[in-house]
Amino acid sequence: MRISLRRARAGELIALAGAVCVIVSLFEPWYQTPSGNRDAWSTFGPAVVLLILAAAGALALFLATITEHSTALPVSAGVWCVLLGLIAVVAAIVRLLERPDHAGSLCAGAWLAFAGAVLILAGAWQSMRDERPSLYEPALPPAQPPPGQS
């Protein structure tokens, strides 16, 4: 297995940035309540699970792109990542609109999670649109003419 960071295109890098945003958002305050700030872990629910799955999908997309020698796995990872990214965007919007337990206002973590979900979706979509097979070495060397023929 050879790792080549040159294979990572703009789409994979955008999705990776989105995954980092989602992961960081999990440890930042999401809501401000009269009793203090609440983060993703204290308001844990299905939306947080979906955000974590989308971040894992974006990481899988990036790792598949830089480690695989063919386009098959990165393309399928991109397709799944688009689906997970779309679901994560909807989940993040729900978490922005539906505040738990008397939360007065939103904090940076909720907005960072939303931005990360949008970046994952946009990056995965761009990854699917960018078809450059020249980034991958051919599986077989090109056929050579028999000796004596040109």
Where are these regions (language model features)?
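Compact integral membrane and secretory-pathway proteins
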Residues: M1-S150
